Amino acid sequence: MIRAEHIFKSYTNGKTVTEVLKDISLEIEGGLCVILGASGSGKSTLLSVLSGLETPDSGKVVCAGEEISAMTDKARTDFRRRKVAFVFQQYFLLPHLTVEKNVKLGADLAGNKNYAEMIEAVELGDKKKKFPTELSGGEQQRVSIARALAKNPEVLFLDEPTGALDEKTGRKVIDFICRLQRERGFTAVMVTHNTNLAEIADTVIKMNSGKISEVYQNQTPKSVFEIGW
């Protein structure tokens, strides 16, 4: 579970102070949560604060049973290694390593040994000896998903994971994420500007100008292949 209580976050540039998160409180019980909002609404900053990549100016954040807002930088780094994983719009694969070694690197960082299973789970077993430059964009993103899940995280954070992909490839990547989330039971929190993806989520959080404007639950989430794009 993830819980935030009265979170504020601002950035300072010279004499200019910009409030990005304004008194955010929320609970995410599990399943797939989608955070929606226009550019500049604060959704990516919220993801960073919930995951421990950044600290709030004030307020409390609990993620995977630990109060990360009270941790030192070193403790938060250790928390991220142990408990959470990330998938971004950019793949951040090491070009000199094969698919297999890129995924193994994620597993090794967390002391896990299930990297081979994750390569099969994202249907890249036949390409495990290939290098990132030999893969399509969708395949590279699947490698980044496998690398993240090879850590066996309690929470997977995704920031615009299909932003650089075409519709067909994007749907397939989202389908992988949803299927693996259901099979493995981790919590997934995804930031996206694609409002149609609200239909596939268990929980939807809408943001506007640094505040939560709406939160609701879907009783029967749809397949990504049943919605618009």
Model region roles, listed by residue range:
Residues 59-67, 105:
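Conserved ABC transporter NBD signature motif
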Residues 131-141:
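Conserved ABC ATPase signature
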Residues 67, 112-127:
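Conserved ABC ATPase "signature" region
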Residues 150-154:
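A short, proline-enriched helix->beta-strand linker immediately N-terminal to the Walker B motif
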Residues 68-85, 221-226:
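ABC ATPase NBD coupling module
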